[in-house]
């Protein structure tokens, strides 16, 4: 029992992290502001850069220094709310600054973990360590799936359930961060947030966050997911020798001894005689945000056991309500995965090989499983239509909200969006859908420029030339031709193949159609 207890222990921050005073420091708001400018490719908060100034930050800090201000705003929140209802800009500044503050202990933990990847005495970095650092890109998930999933049979496609109340998010954070003032501030912020019910009742993948407080609530949600996700890591590491008599060690760690008996009563009948079914060395777990995939080489019975385990574990020990329609068990041979803005599938391909043995010739058919990824064209067009680049049928339209910008700014924004989409979907097995998306953006840019000049697209391009747009829509093939200037055939072949990049940390905003 002591062995399992030590395995479940996490390196939480046992010391007191006095982070709350940082909310009154001006440089924290400057850091949050710089992060916000580099985050959005659509530049939805274009006015945020114009409104931000250190003078506004100083006035906000002065108001927060008033000891009675927070008390008055709490007692009279319906008449004079501190933020979130009447002053969205203050809410944006405070939430983004506070999210930067809350991430400091976790960033320090990451830095301490990366210390092992420093240069050795010979001045070289170990290759295994370097590969581990590159795995921070979400494109590394597809290279992993490409290598592993083609040999598996079943997949458990799960939308992670949401917590019943946001206070559960704060309690999960309490065991990682020992700072009572900061946690009280989190509770106050959630109380003032006027639309907090939508965060836990959305039907989308994971909580539905407002644009203003997105980073802050994603931080809370991810800290909660990591809390129970570490249990699954423990289960996977111990699966080779886990027996039914030791299953009670899988109790939720916050109340390690208090819930042992209750766990045994609830799940003993389901798992006591069949725990050997979890000793599956081909079980693979992948998660991004609110969606996870569990793939196995076992039978459908194995996947149903895992399904039953997840539902009971979430509901009994993390107070998460899981609905059956959020969990799907599918066979990989006839099902496509909708994951990370790609449609992924495993298809069986046959090839005929001519063999010769002595004087005899014969043909043999070899069947292999190939992992394919495609751009979901219909959801992508829906995202473009929602952002007013085209209509629902995919016909490009002008971007009306950008008409007041200069021509160079309009072209720069459209070109940046097209390049980012091309960069993110470089792993697609078929580039025709991606070419259609780029065509929609290019024609939408032309119509926006023509409308700003009160002209037609044909007349505008006749005056300025089509080269005006081509300059800002550099394709991946042209980029590769610069890398391989003497081998254009190599660059064309590389462009037609799937390419996974190691510098992508999040889903493209337009590609995130969930």
UniProtKB/Swiss-Prot annotation:
Main location: plastid
GO CC term (a single one): chloroplast
Compartments, record wording: Plastid, Chloroplast
Source domain of life: Eukaryota
Alphabetically ordered keywords of this record: Chloroplast, mRNA processing, Plastid, RNA-binding, tRNA processing
Entry keyword annotation includes Plastid: yes
Keyword set includes Plastid: yes
GO terms classed as biological process: mRNA processing; RNA splicing; tRNA processing
Coiled-coil segments on the chain, per record: none
Example of a GO MF term: RNA binding
Transmembrane regions listed in the UniProt entry: none
Pfam families with a match to the protein in the record: Intron_maturas2, MatK_N
HAMAP family: MatK
Task of the protein: Usually encoded in the trnK tRNA gene intron. Probably assists in splicing its own and other chloroplast group II introns.
The family this protein is said to belong to: Belongs to the intron maturase 2 family. MatK subfamily.
Protein name: Maturase K
Organism: Trachelium caeruleum
